[in-house]
Amino acid sequence: MHLRRVRTMPRHSQSLTMAPYSSVSLVEQLEDRILCHEKTTAALVEHAFRIKDDIVSSLQKMQNKGGGDRLARLFLEEHIRNITAIVKQLNRDIEVLQEQIRARDNISYGTNSALKTLEMRQLSGLGDLRGRVARCDASIARLSAEHKTTYEGLQHLNKEQQAAKLILETKIKDAEGQISQLLNRVDLSISEQSTKLKMSHRDSNHQLQLLDTKFKGTVEELSNQILSARSWLQQEQERIEKELLQKIDHLSLIVKENSGASERDMEKKLTQMSARLDKIEESQRRNAEGQRKPEEEKVHGRISKLELQMTEDMKEMKAEVNAGFTAIYESIGSLRQVLEAKMKLDRDQLQKQIQQMQKPESSM
């Protein structure tokens, strides 16, 4: 007797392709063991029937031959033992199979419940996925609309950026032209100031040379006047000495002519003459010293006046040169400050325009 079991899958496993791997493998193992037990029981039953057939045939032969009771009894006992053993084995196998069937039913119930829960989860997941897909479609449509608007805005911003770039380039060119003009003006002013400085330096040098020549001329004139005064004094002294010598000679002649006069009168006259000569010499010396002192004082006064005038002229020229230098430095400093302020303003304007252009780019 052959027993045959067909392996069937549950409905949920047929409807759903996914199941827990551990439960499926355990069910398959149980089914394999049941098939193996069925095969063994079928083999034992076949073996018992074969023994039965052998016994029946042997009994028939013994009955035909006669005197086979004892042997038949032995065969029957052997057959009964075999059958009881087979029945016991079958009972044990049936119990094992029942337990395995109960375990398989429990496992199949668990797998069915798990599959049902999985199916419910999958259905809920599918509904959730459908809702998500619908929401994704709506968000995709919204994003496509936003993308379109942003693309149009980007194109508009690109056009504005190009226009602003052109305006900024023109402004930069204008600023560069203004800066170049200012630099040219500064160069011209610096060259003019340098030429003025050179001219003032030349004029100051020329005036100093003129003052030097004037001072030298006055010194030479004073020295000539001093020399002329000294020569006049020497001439006057020589003239007075000649007059005195002439008078002395005249007196000596008179003395020789009047040798007959008394010695007292001669002595008196000589003393008077010597006194007169002394007085004349003192007066002449006083007159010469008096004339020399005012002339020397005049010369010293003129020299001091010339020195004071020259020092005052030098101070005035130095003050004028310093004033010119300070005015030039002040004008250069003011020009530099104006240029730096203008360049700073232009730089700030350019930086503001660049930042204004960079803001839409960063937002883009």
UniProtKB/Swiss-Prot annotation:
One Gene Ontology term of the molecular function aspect: molecular condensate scaffold activity
Chain intervals with Basic and acidic residues compositional bias: 275-300
Primary location recorded for the protein, binned into one broad class: other
GN (gene name): Fam81a
Keyword Coiled coil attached: yes
Name of the protein this chain belongs to: Protein FAM81A
PANTHER family assigned: PROTEIN FAM81A
Function: Facilitates the interaction and assembly of proteins within the postsynaptic density by promoting the condensation of postsynaptic proteins via liquid-liquid phase separation. Required for neuronal activity. Accumulation at the postsynaptic density results in enlargement of dendritic spines.
Coiled-coil region list: 80-107
Family affiliation: Belongs to the FAM81 family.
InterPro entries: FAM81
Keyword annotations from UniProtKB, A to Z: Coiled coil, Cytoplasm, Synapse
UniProt keyword annotation of Coiled coil present: yes
